[in-house]
């Protein structure tokens, strides 16, 4: 929630104010976001291995401290170099103290209800997005420097105590996966254990499957849209469509509300129906939504974008984790996600750069958003082809 509220979903508003104060181009501001996503992608395999080995709590604690200090230093920047350096700190802190680290714990705690559990965990991020108008009010009333300083202090004050609640595996507290210790007979328990063991891939085994690469590429294509919206939708609404910063913040809040509905629906749908088919539908919705906002000529089109993109993002996001966990098992999940991030980072970093560069050249976001929408549509075919891999070979005992 803190990462979504203070940074990821609020960054578009910072872009507008930083442009006004320093005169930096959209490409330069998008470049900072892109470089930090590359940095986080490279960090992914190491981070995943550390979480698998030492558990999520210590990694979360380190990440929260780096994130908070990064925001405090960000409030003092006076050049593009110091902006990039502090932004890199924020990104590293967000990676270590956020999504990927927490998902390792959730995947280990849930099996039958995994998609629902992941969906509920994503609600925190969405709740942060709903509060973006409050961040924008603070930005407009007190300036971006004060808001950044306050954000860093809030992160440290709230994040560190919350970390104490996180446990790596149910065995640490004497619990069972899915919290149901007595519902299965000893025979059924044995059968489930054998099944789970057969589905457990090492990182090396997972990377030998086509599904690993197809899911990662499809995820990257989705993030072409998600990342470009994070960075550029507020500038597009204010500069291109004539909305005020506060009105743009309300659009972000509406989009986030739709995202929350999507997450709740996605958890149920993901546990009941084919996850790949759901992901394909979401990729198409991402593409249509971005095309709608690119050529919006009426507020109804802006609302349509918020609905389509928010629902697609909310439904698809948790399934990216659940699908990998279903295919490759929980034992090496952190490491597998880490190596996958090396591919996913190209979408997360490329989207803002493409949109920003083409906006600087042509004076609007229409072409950039169109190109990225096509990329999302192409990504739907990756999920179509990502069939479940065969269980890895085991040495006979």
Set out the residue ranges of the language-model regions.
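Helix-loop-helix hairpin linking two adjacent transmembrane segments in secondary transporters
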Residues: 125-171
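Structural signature of the two symmetry-related core transmembrane helices
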Residues: 59-72, 277-291
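Central cavity-lining transmembrane alpha-helices of secondary-active solute carriers
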Residues: 34-47, 253-266
